[in-house]
A protein has these predicted regions:
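Glycine-enriched alpha-helix->loop->beta-strand junction motifs that scaffold or abut catalytic
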Residues: 82-84, 157, 206-213, 231-236, ...
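Hydrophobic faces of well-ordered beta-strands that scaffold small-molecule active sites
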Residues: 60-68, 86-88, 112-116, 161-163, ...
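A conserved glycine-rich beta-strand in the N-terminal activation segment of trypsin-fold
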Residues: 24-33
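Divalent-metal coordination cores built from histidine and acidic residues
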Residues: 76-166, 170-184, 188, 237-239
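His/Asp/Glu-enriched, well-ordered alpha-helical/loop segment
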Residues: 253-337, 344-353
């Protein structure tokens, strides 16, 4: 006689899914749901558990837009638009902290990580831009001033420090100050994100120890040797669609070429849109996904770009879900990802009963 399947303890339920992405594709799977936690149990084939609901599609950690400016948009539609978490890379500290708090308590509000104010050289970008209030910017000229700015971001619970290196008509840090700011941030335990614009700025950032480029370099075509150096030292936030918003431009072509070679060289790509910069959709940007696909990223690489910090075994609070499994046709991958929804783990059984 076959043994009856085990009964889940009170508060636990088991669900199945057609596929699960946890830094890699797990295939048909069984997952255990306990409150707001969803844990991968193992392959569906041969499982001794008895799922009480089936998720008809693929489960991911919550999709992240790794470059937004929530002070320039209404973030209310992000979760409904398929984005579970954002990294705000320039904002008023008090305002972005309020949005962080909302994301921690409201199921329909996007989860927020943030860098806080932009740290730049005196007169540096974006102090000359109308869209950037002075409260968004810390202009620093000395190591003492940069230390104070970094300490302010740390005290505000920032997840990163953002610096700007825009040499197109604006001052940038000297080599000494650049390395000083990066070292101070690292000593405080925070990664450094840099805005690199103008000849040589991406390579300056990498040489100084910057961790993440806020944009794919678009003002110059980098050499293969430079691309290789970047691939071994930084990750890049894509932001391709801002160069034309679906229209062909020289900047889009340069950035796409740089990102294609960067990804082929093994570089880490993060999905990001620079939301707030022009006519971009609130939520998943299908044009950005199509640009990533055209740059050579396959389904696994796009998943990795959308989930930059994947768990190896579990999800908390929310998941991203796409009906079906990743298509075998490369031309269909981007549109498949653009259909993602954000779901609360606590409601999965009711959603898919």
């Amino acid at each position: 006689m076959n043994a009856a399947p085990p009964v889940a303890p009170a508060g636990e339920t088991y669900v199945s899914a057609d596929d699960v992405w946890l830094g890699g594709w797990r295939g048909p799977s069984v997952l255990r749901s306990t409150g707001n936690i969803l844990e991968w149990v193992g392959p569906l084939s041969g499982s001794t558990e008895a799922p009480t609901a089936h998720i008809p599609g693929t489960v991911f950690g919550g999709f992240t837009d790794s470059h937004v400016h929530l002070g320039l948009v209404d973030p209310a539609g992000l979760v409904a638009g398929g984005i579970a978490r954002v990294l705000d890379l320039g904002n008023n500290l008090d305002e972005v902290r309020a949005l962080w708090g909302l994301g921690e308590t409201e199921a329909t509000a996007v989860a927020v990580d943030y860098a806080g104010a932009l740290i730049t050289a005196p007169g540096g970008y974006p102090s000359d831009r109308s869209w950037a209030p002075s409260s968004w910017i810390r202009e620093v000229a000395t190591p003492e001033e940069s230390a104070a700015a970094v300490s302010e971001m740390v005290a505000a619970a920032a997840s990163a420090v953002k610096i700007t290196l825009n040499a197109v008509g604006a001052p940038v840090f000297s080599e000494r100050m650049l390395r000083t700011v990066v070292t101070q941030a690292h000593n405080a335990g925070l990664p450094v994100v840099a805005h690199p614009e103008g000849a040589g700025q991406a390579m300056r950032a990498a040489a100084a120890g910057v961790d993440i480029l806020a944009h794919t370099p678009w003002t110059e075509r980098l050499s293969d040797d430079e691309i290789s150096a970047l691939a071994s030292s930084v990750s890049i936030i894509s932001t391709l669609d801002i160069h034309g918003y679906g229209q062909a431009t020289e900047a889009f072509a340069i950035a796409s070429d740089n990102l294609s070679r960067f990804a082929a060289a093994g570089g880490v790509v993060r999905y990001g849109t620079d939301l707030g910069n022009g006519p971009l959709p609130i939520g998943i940007n299908a044009r950005e996904l199509a640009a990533l696909s055209a740059a050579g990223l396959d389904a696994g690489a796009i998943a990795a770009a959308l989930v930059p910090h994947p768990s190896s075994a579990s999800f908390v609070e929310r998941i991203s879900w796409i009906p079906g499994v990743a298509p075998a046709d490369p031309d269909a991958v981007a549109s498949w990802f653009s259909t993602a929804s954000v779901l609360a783990i606590s409601a999965l059984k009711e959603t898919f009963a």
